[in-house]
Amino acid sequence: MKQLLAIFALLLSSLPALAQNNAAAQANIIRPGDNLVLENIPAIPAAIAEKAFQYGEVRAAALQDWDGSRREMLIITRFADVPQVHVVKMPGGARTQLTFFPDRVGGAHYGPKGSNYFTFVKDVGGGEWFQFYRYDLADGNVTLLTDGKSRNTGRAFAHNDNRFAYSSTRRTGQDTDIWIMDATNPKTDRTLLQLEGGGWGATDWSPDNQKLLVLQEISANQSYLWLVDAASSEKKLLTPKAGAEEVAYSGGTFSKDGKGFYTTTDRDSEFKRLAYFDFATMKPAYLTPDTKWDVDEFDLSDDGRTLAFVANEDGVGKLYLMDTTTRKYHSVSGLPAGQVFGLSFHKDNLELGFVVNSASSPSDVYSLNVPTGKVERWTFSETGGLNTATFSTPQLIKWQTFDSKTISGYLYAPDPKKFPGKRPVIVNIHGGPEGQFRPGFLGRNNYYLNELGVALVFPNVRGSSGYGKSFLKQDNGMNRDHTHKDIGALLDWIRQSPNLDGGKIMITGGSYGGYMTWAVAYEYNGKICCSLPIVGPSNLVTLLEHTEAYRRDLRRVEYGDERDPKIREYLEKTAPLNNSEKIQKPVFAAVGKNDPRVPWTESRQMLDKLKGNGITIWFLMANDEGHGYAKKKNQDFLFYATVMFVRQFLLGENVSAAAK
């Protein structure tokens, strides 16, 4: 009995030490939040975050709108967990936060000149059921304007008026009707047009606020512009289909005299040019006839005299100003090389606001004084204390694919002095699929370059935008697997490169890039080390059957209609889900439970089939996210888990929670 008591006493005396040891062990790992679901992801050593942490402490800013009466603006940036609305009252001034929500906020727009409010857009948990709100500047009160249930998008604001037109799925959950509301009185909300399809959106009001331009999008290659009477709802097709050619339009802005409108279109061209249509003749006058690149966006000054536009020149944004009377234009100098977007003229017609993103700087807001050419920087986003001047600059690369076409992309290489020899590679495939990788600030991805010596390649395979409408169509329907072969050719190009290690390649991508990651993982299993699909479809048939209804027909134009037996057979044959037995390398899949575009079950069904392959499978799901991670805490955990995955399965390191 005494012996038992002695043993019991010994056990009791050891409990504090055991508790201390357990606490120390817990302190040495990065703990996931209760909102995260993990499968097979080992405990992440806290040491991983010691250097990687800085790369996540980077901010960015996006211009939302100018104040109509003062020289100040609304921007979106993040100081806590998610982006919120801030006001900046001078170049380089303080970013004063106005909204405080647990979910991301965007689309902030001031009311008309003399008003004392702005409207903004917000969803919950990444579900993309966007609602409009009004923020009263006098007291900070927030009012819900829409129904709180449907998906509401695409606002167009009347001139010097509280009304705005917008798109909503309220009636059917699938079709986007056009509605009009007075932002100061939600009870004025009314339906302007009942429509079929999910691709409708108002773009502008006429100068007298009597009519609206409305864009109908069928696909990335096909869209139409309509003229709609704001009182009677009568609509007229302005851009009927002419012959067999599919034509795309982007945006639509009335001229100041109301006699015509500006838009960008690939009509009669491979690329989207800036054009003016006179209502009397409806014959286009191409304002940038010699451009060999897409015009990405444009904005017209309030007096109608100056038109600013951005040309996408091989992925680099070039800003131009045009005199609408002479139609002569010139480029704007003195800007960092990179992406330029978010154009917005001040009501004074003197200043143009925009955002610049470059390899050494995250997105920040600038202004241009049009008469003097003076450029001023309004925001200076933090970069985690990192010396961004030393960051890798992108190199344009090109390779021949299976059918002799030339495919291009961008290579970011580590410093050869710090990391000599052939370097491991991460191939990161963009989404869309009609997207385009454009060189700019890489954020957390700079960690792999600067700290691990891993090169990054961002391909623009066929079907990417920015290279002409013929190139954009080359992956449609039953040509889907041609894009896989473009990556296969890239893998061969990497193996032949004198500076890259073709034996150490990881594939990753988000959304459609996630689908491509799954596809490459099975088609080129022997040429890669591991893969990381993020919110990626595993079967385009099940994707089309389960994506939200308002998206389905738009995606069918791109992927093919799964209700057609021949298309369905092809999609099933090439689906990664139905070729899962060929994947024999480690996989890490990350999803958001509320994703309306690619349901999380796309990854779940794939991982369930992969379990029989006897390979390493990691899975991460955020219960409070959708199509990608918007909350910093979730981004951080995914980043640290990815770093561990890269170090273990691409670089071959022994990484564990016990590692120092």
Predicted regions: what is each one?
Residues 47-86, 109:
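Beta-strand-rich domains and repeat architectures in extracellular enzymes and scaffolds
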Residues 21-60, 88-104, 125, 135-151, ...:
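Multi-bladed beta-propeller domains
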Residues 63-72, 108-117, 155-163, 203-211, ...:
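Blade-terminus and WD-like Trp-Asp/Gly-His loop motifs, strongest in beta-propeller folds
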Residues 377-420:
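N-terminal cap/lid segment of alpha/beta-hydrolase-fold proteins
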Residues 78-82, 125-130, 170-176, 218-223, ...:
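Short, solvent-exposed loop/turn segments at conserved positions within beta-propeller repeat blades
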